[in-house]
Amino acid sequence: MESNDIRMNLATEEYLMNHADVSEPLFLVYIQSPCVIIGRNQNAYEELDLNYLRKNHITLTRRISGGGAVFDDLGNMSFSFVKKRDEVQFGDYQNVTEPILAALHKMGATQAQSGGRNDLYINGLKFSGNAMYSKNNRTYSHGTLMYDVDLSVLDRILTVSKEKIASKATPSVKKNVTNVRGYLKPEYQFERTEDFRDQLLCELYGVKSLTEIKDKELALTQADREAIQKLFDEKYANDAWIFGEAPAFEYNKRTRIASVGIVDVKLNVVHGKISAAKIFGDFFGQQPVEQLSDFLVGKEYRFEAIEKALKQIKVSEYIHNLTNEDFLALLFS
């Protein structure tokens, strides 16, 4: 696919699953800018260091399939198979990913194999995770393929203290990971992920050049593009989908701040909005801190939303010497 935006690519996937002719299975491949995709049943606040994502301009979205959170960048190639429901058994990832493994074996990664519920491994290290979704007698299975991903980012993203947030969402399970590039034959260790993608496609289809399978390329109409853009706007780029779909959870943060004292914040968040707030501590204030707690109730629990709302008040009136900026950091640290 043309886009490097995961939100557009997921919108395209969903649209094609629902509307494309799948008399022949569809195979989609795409490469995207740095992003994190959480599973359908996950809580972004619990899974991720959202401050790190925001500061490093890493896109966040939610997919419609289950599973855990994944990080993609331009060193990753994602792929999707869309088939009739009766052509694939839900959860049979080994069957779905077999063509990918066969192609990788031809390219030199002979130790690559399926393992666990839905992963691909090489020498005991994970390089691909997969998930499935079924609807209207169709199933799509999509997955990542870590070719040359910046692995140093992974631990920075998937780090949130369990003491800070408690919810009933599905947690991600960290696994030791690797990139597949170093396991390929030297002639296939390309500098660009796009070149790896093209070679993998050639191996999958048994051709020497992509021009030989040009007729298999799916062309989108203007109506298709408009429908996909609508999905992008209303779903994958919409905070209500990304955050509002999160299961109810509690946020707890207790810290000591110089010249302020101890500040202990407890929030309940339901459907992405603060439903209850309590602030405790040994700090001083000119106004009852309960007014600050009440001010938070009903607000969207998003950094940008709370930052905008706090422009209406001065936190230091309720918690002496605490700036709006420091209070904001306390709510999202």
Question: Which residue ranges define each predicted feature?
Answer:
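Structured beta-strand/loop patches that form or line metal/cofactor-binding pockets in enzymes
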Residues: 223-270
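Long, positively charged amphipathic alpha-helical accessory segments at protein N-termini or as interdomain linkers
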Residues: 100, 104-107, 136-243, 287-333
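Beta-rich nucleic-acid/ligand-interaction surfaces
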Residues: 114-130, 219-232
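N-terminal lobe of the biotin/lipoate ligase/transferase fold
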Residues: 1-91
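FAD-binding core of FAD-dependent oxidoreductases
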Residues: 63-78, 120-122, 126, 131-139
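Short beta-strand elements
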Residues: 131-132, 145, 255, 263-281
